[in-house]
Amino acid sequence: MSAAVADGLTAEYVQLQPGPFTGQWTVVCTRTTVVQIGREDVAVVRRLRVPRRRWAVIVPLIVPAAARWNASAMRPQDVLICAPGTECFAFDPPGTRFAVLTFATSTTTSTRLARLAAECAPSGVATLRDEDAAALGEEILRLGTRGRSHAVDLGRLFRTCLMRATPRMRQVDSAVGRSQIVQRVEEFCRRHAGEPLSIAQLSSVAGVSERSLRNAFYDVYTTSPKRYLKLLQLHQVRRALRAVCGEDGTVTNVATLHGFYELGRFAGEYKALFGEAPSQTLHKARARKPSSPLGLA
């Protein structure tokens, strides 16, 4: 689904429950706005990066109470404002549905977003009026089915929602620090892919105690750092297998490059999570054209 994300956004998904990934991503482009509607049928961790010349607003459509966006529980009337060049982190339970609205930094809507984001700092969580949130959700869903012809009404409604939005209560601000801990650890793990990393080492990198590290991961991703990083490794292998060109790449080479040396155990964990053996992933990648990436990335 990452391959379907548009308007300069980049997304990474880490699947938390076993089985084939299923979901949907709909993109509607207008003159001033890109509306992207996502649905995930399995529990995932989602990491979204916003380009430097875009503002992004993430709107909950159907979001279970267990969901966490930047370590904050999101209510139906909340939206998450993501400034240009930033990242947001989410745990989405099965059945989560949301929309991402993006605006160029040169638009008048972005001017209002900048003011509201400053008021909501550092959490970025703003609260809409109940009636505004309900109307916005309905318009987004209509746009997803009717397409671009309905976008003018959505743009007007969204600007009205922004004018009447308020910052969420400050108790969510502590979530920002936990998101930063997770971000530092993830970046370190990506730079040291394939190396054995201990929880003690990761807590030192993050500058917190092991207990604080565990709490941060549970708050942001609702799972332990050890389990999350193992799943991240498996996804890195999956991406690498899908990117293999020609006959030189092998499952063994890719797996060991990412720190998996017990190949039988690795193959079992991989198949349990993704519903197919790593050799099947590699075979499909070789059969596909390089310009046609599919599925979860």
Q: What positions do the PLM features span?
A:
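Short, conserved glycine- and acidic-residue-centered signature motifs
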Residues: 50, 178, 230
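Nucleic acid-binding interface residues in structured DNA/RNA-binding domains
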Residues: 235, 271, 277
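Alpha-helical DNA-recognition elements
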Residues: 219-220, 272-273, 284
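Short, basic-rich loop-to-helix N-cap that marks the start of a DNA-contacting helix
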Residues: 227
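Alpha-helical bundle regulatory/interaction domains
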Residues: 1-16, 56-57, 64-193, 198-200, ...
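N-terminal low-complexity or simple alpha-helical regulatory segments
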Residues: 1-53
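Short hydrophobic/aromatic patch on the recognition helix
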Residues: 213, 217, 265-266, 270
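Alpha-helical structural segments
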Residues: 231-239
